[in-house]
Amino acid sequence: MDLASKYFNGVNWRYIDHSSGLEPMQSFAFDDTFCESVGKDISDNVVRTWIHQHTVILGIHDSRLPFLKDGIDYLTNEIGYNAIVRNSGGLGVVLDQGVLNISLMFKGQTETTIDEAFTVMYLLISKMFENENVDIDTMEIEHSYCPGKFDLSIDGKKFAGISQRRVRGGIAVQIYLCVEGSGSERALMMQTFYEHALKGEVTKFKYPEIEPSCMASLETLLNKTITVQDVMFLLLYAIKDLGGVLNMTPITQEEWQRYDTYFDKMIERNKKMIDQMQ
């Protein structure tokens, strides 16, 4: 069975729209919550859309930067961005109103390889933009922020990055899509963040040497006006075109209780980062 049929054809997908009103830490807590629900067979697969204002989501490796406080001071005091540490992925990414995040949560244990889980997201994104005259490539864009094997790019310019996380029998695959605005300006901001947070110090972990010109938004790459709302519609149409069956089952009481636990963990993780900077 091909992956499109396995994950979409006749498969129920529960759509959660969190495109407004949430704080970033809440988003990561919700993904863990739904991941566990799917893993325990008490929820259909989940697709969740989320958008956040002016936040840099740092990875685990970023929390070990030698001058992290200086980097965060630059983001907050000079640029007006908040910074938090997430629970998936290793390096920082930029979120704002022009960046659409999509999370797919589905059941999977060790038999579901990391590459297979990433490919499910790639298939969906490819379907969303199949009417555009472009080739979407999957390969690491070395000089982007948060470079990875499953970076998505057009003509060598990265517009999206994918991470995944596994929680209690469920898999969450998360993508950020740089839709509106300037991808290179976002990359310049991250380049400057690392300059402040490293100050030229040599570290065991190799942080990205960012070249802003290797990143761009879909608006730029497709050479047309496209909004995050447009892409949200493309997402839902793509799931239906692949044979998926959408529903909008509300969050259950049990999920709200589990969410509280995961949210507390996110708060604790970020408190540790703040304490380390004192």
From Swiss-Prot:
It comes from the Bacteria. GO terms for biological process: lipoate biosynthetic process; protein modification process. Pathway: Protein modification; protein lipoylation via endogenous pathway; protein N(6)-(lipoyl)lysine from octanoyl-[acyl-carrier-protein]. The record marks 158 as: Lowers pKa of active site Cys. PROSITE patterns: BPL_LPL_CATALYTIC. The active site is at residue 146. Residues 41-247 form the BPL/LPL catalytic domain. InterPro entries: aa-tRNA-synth_II/BPL/LPL (IPR045864), BPL_LPL_catalytic (IPR004143), LipL (IPR024897), Octanoyltrans_LipM/LipL (IPR050664). The keyword Cytoplasm does not apply. Its EC number is 2.3.1.204. Keywords: Acyltransferase, Transferase. It catalyses: N(6)-octanoyl-L-lysyl-[glycine-cleavage complex H protein] + L-lysyl-[lipoyl-carrier protein] = N(6)-octanoyl-L-lysyl-[lipoyl-carrier protein] + L-lysyl-[glycine-cleavage complex H protein]. PANTHER family: OCTANOYL-[GCVH]:PROTEIN N-OCTANOYLTRANSFERASE, OCTANOYLTRANSFERASE LIPM-RELATED. HAMAP family: LipL. The reaction proceeds via a thioester-linked acyl-enzyme intermediate. Belongs to the octanoyltransferase LipL family. This is Octanoyl-[GcvH]:protein N-octanoyltransferase. The gene is lipL.
